[in-house]
Amino acid sequence: MASLLTLDRVTAGFVPDIDILQNVSLEVAEAGITGLIGLNGAGKSTIMRTICGFLKPKSGRIIYNGDEIAGIAPHSTIARGIWYIPQESSLYPRMSVSDNLWLPLEHLRRCGILSRDETHHRVDEATTRFPVLKTKWSANAGDLSGGQQKLVEFAKAFVIRPRLCLIDEPSIGLSPKVAGEIYDCIDAFVSGGMTVLLVDHNVRRVVRTSHHIYVLSLGQITASGSPADFAGDLHEQVKSWLGIEF
């Protein structure tokens, strides 16, 4: 598969003298799932925040669809087809579920990317695909359970239909049932041609789901390979580095 996103020796940090990411290089193949695993504090979320423009790298390049995007503002990355589903809810708690869903669509419409008819069509499709939208349409997002909020987050990605979706810890704190629904969504996204960069504390699930996996340790890529690679010698090395079974 061709590469949609490339990080080339990216170094980044939130303060001048501390680098959370150190010369990170990786590639995300188009229309597939690239998994990123590592211990807490390894820098996985920082990679995602750097890609989508919340953190400007100190050095290195970020190439998306052939264009350099390092340091571009988040609203510009959205218009380019990059969407971020963070670990914490990004919904506006005092806004209704419907308003949370419509807000990014209106941004894309104002950018000339979507027509008004297309935005309505996508919302209609989402209400069929995600039952929580029908039952909680007028409710404030802050009144929803954690699982319901996560499903609304994925409904937003469904209507936006980015080319690249960055998904950070989608199953943390969720019941097995809701976590299964979330991964069904991810599978459907990729089947529809979306590209996914996935981080999840459930390493077994990441290895089973992804087409290619990178291991991050202390801000550096320490291993990478296909799921088959992780069934052999690399499996034993990564178990030793992470101190976990998968």
Model-flagged regions — what are they?
Residues 1-4, 11-23, 30, 73-74:
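A short, flexible loop at the N-terminus of ABC-type nucleotide-binding domains that lies
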Residues 15, 95-121, 129-131, 225:
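ABC-type ATPase nucleotide-binding domains, specifically the catalytic core motifs of the NBD
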Residues 37-39:
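The feature captures the beta-strand-to-loop junction immediately N-terminal to the Walker
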Residues 52:
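Helix-to-loop junction immediately C-terminal to a conserved catalytic motif
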Residues 60-69, 80, 118-123:
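Conserved ABC transporter NBD signature motif
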Residues 82, 88, 128, 215-218, ...:
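C-terminal boundary and immediately downstream tail of ABC-type ATPase nucleotide-binding domains
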Residues 140-144:
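Conserved ABC ATPase signature
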Residues 157-158:
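ABC ATPase C-loop
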